[in-house]
Amino acid sequence: ANGDWPGSNMKLWRERVAGSKWRWMIYDLDFTFGGNAQGLATTNTLAQATATNGPDWPNPPWSTLMLRKLLDNPDFKNEFIQRFAAHVNTTFEPNHVLAVIDSMAGNIASEIPRHKERWPQSISFGNSWQELVDIMRNFAIDRPANARGHFYSKFGISGSSSLVIS
């Protein structure tokens, strides 16, 4: 969940040559993973990204137009829902995300004292480094169920089924 999106922190571009494809990039994700009150595990970013009349920040109508129009296409809508389901059950499965967080935190933990000394305002929540990592860990645990609920509500899905391939 990024509470500072989709009206900011994204860029769209393409080369000005025949046949070039549009590119999309999101950046500046410090409002994600529970790092800000607008980026909590319960934040309904699907509603933000599809609102027709959002406020100037974070989701003015121009910033949601592309996804709204794409979702008007039944094939795209189905693929969007299917990809979400695949990713929420694999890429964003809590144990997988926790392993990534723990690995990354372990890789940089020894640098945190030097970082705090050099940039004392960069970790400004008043929490310890480990408390900030724990906020991310809790987000990783709580987010999938919330995001599923947002998809179920938006698209009128009554539930899910499990498929095991041996």
Language-model features and meaning:
Residues 1-165:
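Middle-to-C-terminal accessory/interaction subdomains
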